[in-house]
Amino acid sequence: AFCKYNGEQCTSDGQCCNGRCRTAFMGKICMG
């Protein structure tokens, strides 16, 4: 499974390489 880097869009916490999937202005993004 591929993971998303910080600043990239995500749909769940498990998708993020580091940090968590959090709600931002434009949907959800990975933030550490």
From Swiss-Prot:
Expressed by the venom gland. The keyword Disulfide bond applies. InterPro entries: Toxin_29. Disulfide bonds join C3-C17, C10-C21, C16-C30. Keywords: Disulfide bond, Knottin, Neurotoxin, Secreted, Toxin. It comes from the Eukaryota. GO terms for molecular function: toxin activity. GO terms for cellular component: extracellular region. The presence of a 'disulfide through disulfide knot' structurally defines this protein as a knottin. Belongs to the neurotoxin 17 (21C2) family. May act as a neurotoxin. This is U3-ctenitoxin-Pk1a.
